[in-house]
């Protein structure tokens, strides 16, 4: 019985320690357009972080620099700028997914 309690305590400790890492393992999709563009057409559930604010908000919300971050905008131009900013800050898994339509297609091939 004592071993069971010890094993259970170890498993609980491990699950608590790994929970933040597992939560970040899910890919993040970010709309980097303006609020007005986002209101007109957006993908439900994806955060809006305009490309000019990308570094401050991503480093706060997604501190793990290995998180898969997928960026999109109207044409891919602003997503490219945001990608460069994040990579310069040390993010290692950032993708420019192009337009909103291309991002939808990439998620549901």
Question: What label would you give each PLM region?
Answer:
Residues 2, 9-19:
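Bacterial N-terminal signal peptides
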Residues 2-6, 25-28, 35-68, 77-109:
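Rhodanese-like catalytic fold shared by cysteine-dependent sulfurtransferases
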Residues 21-23:
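Non-catalytic, polymerase-adjacent accessory regions of viral genome-replication enzymes
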Residues 72:
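Short, surface-exposed ligand- or partner-binding patches at beta-edge/loop junctions that are enriched
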């Amino acid at each position: 019985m004592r071993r069971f309690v010890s094993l259970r305590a170890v498993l609980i400790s491990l699950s608590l320690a790994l929970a933040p890492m597992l939560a970040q393992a899910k890919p993040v999709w970010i709309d980097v357009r303006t609020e007005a563009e986002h209101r007109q057409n957006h993908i439900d559930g994806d955060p809006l972080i305009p490309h000019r604010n990308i570094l401050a908000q991503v480093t706060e919300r997604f501190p793990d620099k290995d998180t898969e971050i997928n960026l999109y905008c109207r044409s891919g131009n602003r997503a490219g700028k945001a990608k460069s900013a994040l990579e310069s800050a040390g993010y290692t898994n950032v993708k420019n997914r192009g337009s909103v339509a291309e991002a939808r297609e990439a998620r549901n091939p």
